[in-house]
């Protein structure tokens, strides 16, 4: 059996290009002056019940670029929560209770900024923003 070294090199190159994946996560900022620990913000679900939430753009690089708007919680998920983005609509497409994550694939092309609204059942509302031109 004969192997052509050029074919092996081509296959190896394609494999490396498609299998090398790395990620980047950038955090949204809060409009309000609320407690934070760099990536997570402390929000009040209802009187005296607080949750730590992280909101950001999670980008996967590999064979192609994929961007996701991700909202994750450190503890159990809050009840009666609505998450909306000014550019990308409702964020609920990849909800999994065991992961405590809401995620939606987005296209950030031509988007200058975005605002995410977390709204709890008792009308508590938090706003977070991301400026894509600030990078």
Protein language model regions, located:
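Sec-dependent bacterial lipoprotein signal peptides
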Residues: 1-24
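Edge beta-strands of extracellular beta-sandwich domains
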Residues: 124-135
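N-terminal cationic leader/targeting segments used for protein routing and processing
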Residues: 5-8, 80-81, 85
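Short, solvent-exposed, Trp/other aromatic-anchored flexible loops in extracytoplasmic proteins
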Residues: 87-126
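Exposed beta-strand and adjacent loop surfaces of beta-rich binding modules
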Residues: 68, 78-82, 113-115
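Intrinsically disordered, low-complexity segments
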Residues: 17, 83-84, 91
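N-terminal export/targeting and maturation segments
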Residues: 20-77, 86, 130
